[in-house]
Amino acid sequence: MSEAKSSQPDPAPEQPKPFVAPCHDRPPSATLQWLRDGWRDYRAAPGLSIAWGTFCMLLSWSVAWMAWRVGGWVLLLSLLSGFVFVAPLLAFGMYSISRKLCMGRTPTFAGTLRAVRRPIANSLVFALVLLVIFLIWARAASMVHIFFPSTGTLHLREMAVYLGVGSAVGACFAYACFAASVFSLPFIANRDVDVITAVVSSVNAVLRNRWTMFAWAVIVATLTGVGFMTGMIGFIVIMPWLGYATWHGYRDSLDVDGWDVLPAHHD
């Protein structure tokens, strides 16, 4: 007598994830709401915000001091210009704070450190990408040096050409880095997603909402400049605030429901 086979339905095949996260259209005025939401998070977790901001300030001081001791003002300006390439990686802990607050939970310092370590593999890959961009930028900056006036007397017109070309080249690399990182890192911090999908989704959001994201880039650059003008003391407030605001911009701009949420009980 043959044994009856169990009639269990076959498990449904896993739905393939899209290559890029859908993007919502957002007006330039949305950036002001992101800033308001970011400031609300800063006030909701002032101790953690000040701690992370102080860390950014001390790190910036250390880099500036070493650059000045080793290479003088030329290396100092180069490293400060390259700050835009590494600053996004400092924001993982801040994304964790906003993530917890959005869930109605209380963030802790230990939890933010664990959240920074969790996507370490994707972070290292992204850091490698930023390093490549930074090295290309450094090479381009050295090539721009040919526009530096070679005569003993510096004329305003010659300096204007040099500064204009250098600023244009730096702005192109900075905006490319901005497009790749602005929403990809919050995406990685929040969902089970690979680096390529996160970066493509971020670039797509920048291209689709070009004026909104241009306005956001101007805001980020302006506030970062204010931080430098205060001897980097302003980073205590500015860096966490921008990190939180970027998190809310990511949630407002990308539809990431197609990817699994990373567990929050280890944050």
Where are these regions (language model features)?
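Hydrophobic alpha-helical membrane segments
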Residues: 1-267
